């Protein structure tokens, strides 16, 4: 059965399907939209008591529901200076060291940090010998992405690619999955060195957004685009630990890259398949400089 599912991944018109779903998710269809939201809540057992707007009727579109805000304080941020926090609700797929520019995906599969970052060689060099973490967001999860530590945006890269589904099954069977799919790479300068937040697209992910640039995808294309940002002065974009940096309209995966010697140890219980909650302790930092 797994082989059939993977074969379908290669056969499906993934970009066309994703654009169609995106249009439907953005539509405001009144009672039909509310019915779809209620079905989704029941199907995926979503706890709406955490949402700022708990009633399905409050959402004009499915996208509004999917990117719903949480009630203030429902995800308290660990403010300890030596702690990096989880950026999302989800589940850890993999984490560990970046060795010789290679990142572990699943048993028998690695991919290149250079390819992941859109063949930006200077960026890839900055993370050699560092660490990575891959976190999967399931359909039921809260889909806003937050900063694990304070950082100032220096660069954003849009990398075109495939739109394979992103889940444990495809991670095991699709070589180089995260470096093949469409993605947005945001690089921040922090007191611990560079931080890369890679937002990976997937089948029926309607769009990827950032708080500073809005919707990055769609439109899709075949060309890599880069944007440079000032890191000092009035136009610098600095986000605090726990502050929102982006969101998915429908689910996917975040890959984080950390500089060498930024992380001392991952926090207790942070391991593959562990459930994550935004704001909780993710890693202990080697550098004791303030990260909040």
UniProtKB/Swiss-Prot annotation:
Q: Which GO terms describe its biological process?
A: phosphatidylethanolamine biosynthetic process
Q: Which HAMAP family match?
A: PS_decarb_PSD_B_type1
Lineage of the source organism? Answer: Bacteria, Pseudomonadati, Pseudomonadota, Gammaproteobacteria, Alteromonadales
UniProt GO MF annotations: phosphatidylserine decarboxylase activity
Pfam families cross-referenced by the UniProt entry: PS_Dcarbxylase (PF02666)
Site (Cleavage (non-hydrolytic)) found at: 251-252
Gene symbol of the encoding locus: psd
| Superkingdom of origin organism | Bacteria
Q: What is this protein called?
A: Phosphatidylserine decarboxylase proenzyme
Q: In which pathway does it act?
A: Phospholipid metabolism; phosphatidylethanolamine biosynthesis; phosphatidylethanolamine from CDP-diacylglycerol: step 2/2
Its Gene Ontology cellular component terms are: plasma membrane
**Chief localization:** membrane
For membrane topology, the record states: Peripheral membrane protein
What is the UniProt remark on how the cofactor binds and its stoichiometry? Answer: Binds 1 pyruvoyl group covalently per subunit.
Role noted for this protein: Catalyzes the formation of phosphatidylethanolamine (PtdEtn) from phosphatidylserine (PtdSer).
Give the reaction(s) catalysed.
Answer: a 1,2-diacyl-sn-glycero-3-phospho-L-serine + H(+) = a 1,2-diacyl-sn-glycero-3-phosphoethanolamine + CO2
